[in-house]
Amino acid sequence: MNRRLTRGEIFALLGCLALIAVIAATGMPGRQKVWANLGLDGMQAQTELRLEAGDAYGEYGGGPYLDLPAGTYRLRWRISGDGANAIRLSCSNGVEIAPERLSTDPAVWEDEAVFTLPEAVHSFSIHICFCDGTYLRMDDLRLYSPVYTDRAWAAALLLLGAWLLAVIWRRLDAQGRQALALLALAAVFTSLPVLREDAVLSIDTQFHAARIMNLADGLRSGQLPVRVGGFSYNGYGAATSVFYPDALLVPLALMVLGGASITFVLQLFTVLVNGLTAALMYASARRMPGSREAALCASLLYVCSVYRLRGLYETFMMGQVLAMAVLPLFLLGLWEVCRGEAKRWPLLSAGATLIVQSHMLTTLLCALLALCAVLLCLPAMLRERRLPALLKAAGMTLLLNLWTLVPMVTLCLSGVNTGTMQFGFSGSALELHEVLLPDGFIGLPLLLGAALLAGTKAPADGRAARLCAVFGAGAVLLSTKLFPWSYAVRLTGGLIEVLQFPWRFLTLAVPLLAFAAGCGYASGREGTRMAAAVLALSMLCAGPYVGQVVREGEQMRFGEGTNPYMILPEYQIEGTDVGDTRSRTLLVEGDAQVTAYEKEGTRISCAVSAQSDAVLTLPLFGFAGYEATLDGEPLAVGLGENNRLTVRLPAGAQGTLRVRFVNWPLWRVCDAVSLLTLMAAVSAWVMRRRKRMRVMQSDSSCAR
């Protein structure tokens, strides 16, 4: 198969890029949310206030209590009266709305005004101020969101996606095209809940939306890589990016900075992760080894697995779902090192790195799986001298992720906690029927495929499928109450509870059983037809759940943002009260004046003049890494009440104070090491690929 782009494909790509440039330059019609006919508390449309009817001067209304992202909004109203009244805007998290008060002209029935939210607001409210004249009548009230660039992003991605699919399609035979069509259908089917205006609102949607906003805030503040963002906890900031790696989410954060709405970004993530899951499972299963039919069946089973879909839509475990998308690559690499071609050890390092950058708990699960696999295969690995390949993969994985692991450890040592979620670990294990029901966590399609595999004669290369079945069954057992988890908790001194729930072992069980079941389904002669039947069966079992999410699931409305408050003090300094973040004011202790105060995420600037020693307490949590300078000269920083960041001003200090978060010198060294390792790995891969292409061209010339 010729993998080089043809001249026509290159011209088509250039055409797509040119069209995208035109869209960016001319501006595609934006996407805007309109809240029409807004009803306020006690003031609906056509509500009239009259002094002669006993109504008094004062504020009326309140609501609609929206969580809105930062931006410029437009309020349009139809209010009549014989006096100069006003509209007051407010929120519950202390953000200064500019302007806060809008005047109504008695001579103008329909009018509008623009106001700005410098940061995300919680519980946005509109109040009608009846303060002049004898009557006031409100006929209509409309709120217009900022204009988002969702359509431009969607058009650009659709153009590039269509070009990529066309290039792949041209290189496939008839059977390959059938496989691509089935995989695309599975990805579209599992994305149905987000193919609408609003995103699905699940248990953790707000948390992961805040992660993206926190990441975008850190990028806007000039951090690269981002360690502390200033969005979470009402602008006080959180070190989420250190403990919950989000390097793979940077493109989504850049889209937010490019004007995309958070709901569109979450919808796009869902579609992309479904497509990525299908592609990586198919590509990995093809190499494990397995037939094309087995790989296709495995991918369809995996994409449509109820456990994965529940994690995507019921709880929106963004990190775990992303880790599950790249998990097949890790399994392929582990197979190559233990029983396949050991020289392919970079696959194990690549898969492990992607999992580390997705979800730390899945990383622990993969480490346990790798340990068990190595112990099981240790005699053969020693005999075949495979341990050097394993050590190379482990070493490269450590170097590639040094920039993530070292900041995590150092912040833990500095007093930052990793979460306060407490669960009854052994009590949250699953009952067996929850796993084995047709629409259960494992479900009928995987069970049928595994049964077919057990009933077929093992082919010469069937070791991979059977090993996957054994390890998958073991992971299923670990997820249920059949395993003595209460004893395991006591035996490990509670260390095992870091995994939070025993059912997380299904994260490993599902891809392992999917590959085993795929081989079972493909053991017959009608491989492609069987794959179509597998997809139909998977959709039949997953369909009721997907349909329920589409019809009844809660939604995160387009135009609204995520709550800037957080409920639990995760990734915070010990002893922090995250509920005490309503006050966003700068506190001054001592004889000092502060003017021209500006805060943007984790950056603060202001003009200061201190007649005596003074301490400024800033609305930022004081993570180690903040620096303060006065006209370029460093100042001492520390922790104040509720672990807020403090800056000490000496007597006579005068000038411009700037505060920002900077990476520790040790972190910068680790960043450089990981970057150099990545560059070396990519360079080595490119060189090997070019060498292989030259050998193939030489062999082709000799054959002629």
Residue ranges and their predicted role:
Residues 6-72, 78, 83, 88-90, ...:
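Glycan-recognition and processing domains
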